Amino acid sequence: MQPERAQQVVDILRGWGVAAHVAKASAFRHGVRVVIDWKTEAVWDTDGAAGLEAQVLGDGRLVGFVPPIPGSEREDITAEQQAHLIARADYDLT
């Protein structure tokens, strides 16, 4: 995800009350970090692959994975559509 797009998605999510931040995986890879609870977060789309998927981290350790969301790989997907998919994601860790 380009840094500008990541910031757009974060801004939309924050407007909806979601605790979101830009995640910088490297100098050229950015994504979206969503706080799930006080020790768990999801890091979205920092791998550069098509589609939205997330690694779920608890205390900094991988505890789950959200597989690629169908339809999120479209090239014409908007920032608002990406934010909507992230906001509705299932983080079931049971």
Question: Model-found features: residue ranges?
Answer:
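Negatively charged, low-complexity tracts enriched in Asp/Glu with abundant Ser/Thr
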Residues: 1-38
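Generic signature of intrinsically disordered, low-complexity, basic-rich segments
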Residues: 2, 16, 50, 79, ...
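Generic detector of ordered, mature protein regions
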Residues: 22, 26, 31-33, 45-47, ...
